Amino acid sequence: MRTIIACIVALLLFVIAVVIYGVVHNQQATRTGSLCAEYGIPADDPRSNPEPLPETDETGENREVAPDNSIKMNQPLDVHGIRSRYHVFARGVDFSKPVGVVMRLHGDGAYEYDHPEGLLNCMASVAASHNMILVAPRTPDHEGTRTWWENIGESSVWLSGLISQLREDYGNVDTHNMWWMGYSGGAELISYGLLAQEPENITAGAIMIGGGGAPTDKPDPAPALNARLPLYWYVGSKDNGKDPRSTFNALNAANNGAHWYRSRGYDNVQEYVMDGDDHFSIPQAKILDDVLNNQK
């Protein structure tokens, strides 16, 4: 009898162990497959599962810093009275070697900035694999929807100050190897303002995702300065403004922006329409990785 009871107990313990293992394994598999896969990084890629970020909130009052200073969240910056904040992701970057910069501008409303644990953390993982820090600023526009493009002059002044701050904080960061990547309204700022007015700040290239229209009231840029500058436009084939979640016709904007710069002497303009993607599904982390790989 005791032998039977012992066997039953052993069997129950074995079943419990199998169940626990299955739950843990499924949780790990879910995490592995869900963190960065939706942004285009395969689940079996080590970069698809970055470590969690320091705790933050949407108020912008906290200034969380990782113990090794590899991640800085919500850092305040005042540039001639223009105030905003920014995140810096430097985890996994080797500062004994040349370090580049990816400056990533959020879309209207700053959702990505307020929720950095998803897309931004995955993009930082990609940037680090190219030995680049990821900088994610928040627009100094504090009214309404919070956009970059409604006050291009103020946004540009503040971003120039941010570049100076990065040089001061990270002396060996090469701001001559700075890629700008803008999504939606962030792409509009790059194409309307920075490329047309301050091309000297875009030293390595620019990536416009889900936007990036043609300037309408700006003088033509000097193509002799940046004729070979790589300019990329990526937009989803369904990003045509018919989705009630996004009435902005990014397809037209991207086409117009790419044509405008190409017609003004920029001969390294590339435009990609992502089949089946809309304004929200376009794989931004993969795009960043693909573009940086193309420069090697």
What spans do the regions from the language model cover?
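A domain-start/cap signature at the N-terminus of enzymes
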Residues: 4-8, 13-101, 193, 256-259, ...
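Primarily recognizes the serine-hydrolase "nucleophile elbow" in alpha/beta-hydrolase
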Residues: 169, 176-226
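Loop/turn elements at helix/coil->beta-strand transitions in domains of secreted/extracellular proteins
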Residues: 97-101, 129-135, 174-179, 199-206, ...
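Cell-envelope and extracellular/periplasmic
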Residues: 105-110, 167, 183, 190, ...
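The feature captures the conserved acid-bearing segment of alpha/beta-hydrolase catalytic domains
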Residues: 204-285, 289-293
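Short, flexible/disordered intra-domain loops and linkers
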Residues: 112-117, 144-151, 240-252
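Alpha/beta-hydrolase active-site loop
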Residues: 148-172
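Short substrate-entry loop that stabilizes the transition state in hydrolases
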Residues: 94-145
